[in-house]
């Protein structure tokens, strides 16, 4: 057997190492060029890839790896290694990017995209348009080498912060406050709400507001919409939630025939965006053109969402097409990098409060970050909208819609309306099953919550890579602490009791589903099924 020695560089999420490995070269001796796929077969057979990943130090880090090696690269002398494919990432993708120099063709991105998210392989190739992608970012959580990441907007945000003419306002999503600490060595799920606000103020943001506020606003609009459909438009039942942009795009691709079931409500991020440049700008006497709106999200798809053409309600309202509702999105991971760039030790910061006008949030809004949380929050307020009474205790701790099960079902009796049947779904493979039941007229529900990522936003594609691949222990710790925030003593637990949201209606929107609310807080969708047409 012919043997040779190769000097090989192996990349991980943060480091690069080099080493000299003995490999069997017989199959390659007669070739002038070796394909990337064949090269990784060669390296895998010698144990180079697996050994190299471990040698980078991931196994000794609290975050960012734990030394995870895809099965086919474990050990050595396992020729021939089965080198797998990978998902395509277009250069125009607004959410995701790949560093080819780090890709080891392990196939984990393809695995999660196909088997968990049910996107890859659900269309015939070749297609005529860009590669279908719902931008969920789950591939970035499964990639063992850090080759797949979010497309960073840190530089744009830093530039805005350095511009004295700009007023930079930032909103933070509920799920980020139970994950950010993991990037600083804290236990998974640690609540760092006040520290996160303090860090953002230290960095130099002019105002820090809470996406929980607009989650409460979303509940006011969406629960009102459900009541309207139950009473007047039953042909649009069941109503689908629409706050997850990955799910929405999935529905546009693969469910265009049932898209009328989607709620017209924007996500909390996209509701808060136009309000910062209209309502907030007027209250603070700031020119809307000078406001830069940034959001901190657990989700890579939010980068795509803020760039959707229709997300310019503030620009339409103000007659200036250059004004976008949300200018930049940073993931939880990007925020951690920004904090470290500014040499801030998150663990030592004193808690700071959110700023007023758009800063109040209820416990109902906070549980948006967990699968089932949107449904629980919505039904609490739906009950109040119909009865004008607060919901019973059981709806404040609605166990039937909690937990990590991919599909959950529940029902609630609402006086004058009767039994309302609901379902909660996370993971797009599960969504595909639910969609088939809608088509087959076998779905008994009036209201369905959909989240693209298994477990909901707590396990979004922009969250810390605390374990590779993601595991339910970490999802559970993050989820439990969101529910702790909801049940904390003194916390309002009903979205309709958010005083700042009520002030918004009194001063600006009038009431849920009003003409002004429809302009700023509601949207429309695009049939993307034709984008899956086979290229001819």
Model-assigned labels for residue ranges:
Residues 59-64, 71, 75, 80-89, ...:
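Iron-sulfur cluster-binding cysteine motifs and their immediate structural context
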Residues 51-54, 117, 121, 307, ...:
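Short amphipathic alpha-helical interaction/hinge segments
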Residues 26, 31-95, 168-169, 201, ...:
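Non-ligating segments of multi-cofactor redox enzymes
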Residues 1-35:
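N-terminal secretory signal peptides
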Residues 44, 88-93, 98-100, 129-130, ...:
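Short, intrinsically disordered, charge-biased short linear motifs at domain edges
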Residues 36, 40-46, 59-64, 140, ...:
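Iron-sulfur-associated redox domains of electron-transfer enzymes in respiratory
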């Amino acid at each position: 057997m012919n043997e040779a020695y190769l000097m090989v560089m192996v990349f991980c999420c943060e480091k690069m190492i080099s080493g000299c490995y003995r490999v069997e070269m017989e199959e390659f001796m007669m070739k002038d060029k070796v394909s990337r796929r064949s090269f990784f077969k060669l390296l895998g057979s010698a144990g180079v890839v697996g050994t190299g990943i471990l040698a980078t130090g991931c196994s000794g880090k609290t975050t960012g790896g734990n030394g995870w090696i895809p099965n086919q690269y474990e050990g050595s002398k396992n020729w021939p290694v089965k080198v797998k494919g990978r998902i395509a990432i277009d250069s125009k993708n607004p959410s995701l990017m790949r560093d080819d120099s780090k890709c080891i063709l392990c196939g984990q991105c393809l695995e999660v995209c196909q088997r968990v998210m049910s996107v890859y392989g659900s269309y015939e190739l070749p297609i005529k348009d860009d590669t279908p992608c719902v931008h969920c970012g789950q591939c970035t959580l499964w990639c063992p080498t850090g080759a797949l990441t979010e497309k960073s907007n840190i530089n744009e945000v830093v530039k805005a912060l350095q511009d004295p003419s700009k007023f930079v306002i930032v909103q933070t999503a509920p799920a980020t406050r139970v994950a950010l600490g993991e990037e600083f060595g804290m236990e998974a799920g640690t609540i760092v709400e006040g520290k996160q606000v303090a860090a953002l103020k230290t960095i130099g943001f002019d105002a820090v507001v809470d996406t929980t506020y607009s989650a409460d606003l979303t509940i006011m609009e969406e629960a009102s919409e459900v009541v309207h459909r139950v009473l007047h438009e039953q042909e649009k039942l069941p109503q689908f939630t629409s706050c997850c942009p990955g799910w929405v795009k999935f529905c546009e691709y693969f469910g265009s025939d049932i898209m009328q079931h989607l709620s017209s409500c924007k996500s909390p991020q996209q509701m808060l965006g136009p309000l910062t440049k209209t309502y907030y700008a007027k209250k603070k006497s700031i020119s809307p053109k000078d406001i830069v709106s940034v959001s901190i999200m657990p989700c890579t798809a939010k980068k795509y969402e803020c760039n959707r053409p229709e997300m310019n309600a503030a620009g339409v309202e103000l007659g200036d097409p250059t004004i976008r509702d949300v200018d930049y999105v940073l993931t939880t991971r990007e925020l951690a990098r920004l904090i470290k760039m500014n040499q801030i030790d998150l663990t030592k910061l004193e808690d700071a409060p959110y700023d007023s006008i758009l800063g109040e949030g209820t416990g109902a809004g906070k549980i948006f970050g967990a699968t089932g949380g949107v449904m629980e929050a919505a039904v609490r307020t739906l009950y109040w909208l119909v009865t004008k009474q607060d919901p019973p205790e059981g709806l404040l701790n609605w166990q039937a819609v909690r937990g990590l099960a991919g599909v959950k079902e529940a029902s609630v009796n609402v006086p004058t309306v009767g039994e309302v049947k609901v379902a909660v779904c996370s993971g797009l493979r599960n969504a595909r099953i639910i969609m088939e039941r809608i088509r087959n007229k076998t779905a008994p529900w009036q209201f369905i919550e959909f989240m693209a990522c298994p477990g909901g936003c707590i396990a979004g594609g922009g969250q810390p890579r605390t374990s590779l691949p993601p595991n339910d222990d970490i999802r559970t710790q993050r989820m439990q602490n969101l529910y702790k925030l909801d049940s904390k003593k003194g916390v309002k637990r009903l979205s309709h009791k958010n005083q700042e949201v009520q002030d918004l209606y009194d001063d600006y929107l009038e009431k849920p589903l009003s003409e002004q609310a429809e302009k700023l807080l509601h949207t429309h969708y695009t049939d993307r099924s034709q984008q899956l047409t086979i290229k001819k």
